[in-house]
Amino acid sequence: MEEEKHHHHHLFHHKDKAEEGPVDYEKEIKHHKHLEQIGKLGTVAAGAYALHEKHEAKKDPEHAHKHKIEEEIAAAAAVGAGGFAFHEHHEKKDAKKEEKKKLRGDTTISSKLLF
């Protein structure tokens, strides 16, 4: 009888960089552009909600404290989403730089990509 292979399901499936093959820079650029746009959308949405809660705090003095807390939380979420959009913008720029290096035939690997 053949022993059954046991598959262990882990939380994270890590792949070696060597096994991935060539990088599709166009796909990577589109991916980061999409995430950047989602980050911008999140910033606008959270900012709008913060303004709404600020208005509610003035309009509803009985529950003003609750609305002010929710305003602060929404403002923090807007800042976080803005930071994410900024991060993705730079990831997109790095992908464009790597694509240009590839097209030029430059084989040096950026130290950013190693860590």
Swiss-Prot record:
Keyword Nucleus (UniProt): yes
Induction text: Induced by leaf water deficit and fruit ripening.
Subcellular localization: Nucleus
Matches recorded under Pfam families: ABA_WDS
UniProt keyword terms in alphabetical order: Nucleus
UniProt-listed GO biological process terms: response to water deprivation; response to zinc ion
Cross-referenced InterPro entries: ABA_WDS
Top-level taxon: Eukaryota
Coiled coil start-end: none
Stretches with biased composition (Basic and acidic residues): 86-105
Primary location: nucleus
GO molecular function: identical protein binding; nucleic acid binding; zinc ion binding
Gene Ontology CC: one annotated term: protein-containing complex
Region (Disordered): 1-22, 83-115
Compositionally biased region (Basic residues): 1-15
Family: Belongs to the abscisic acid and water stress-induced protein family.
Record protein name field: Abscisic stress-ripening protein 1
Recorded name of the encoding gene: ASR1
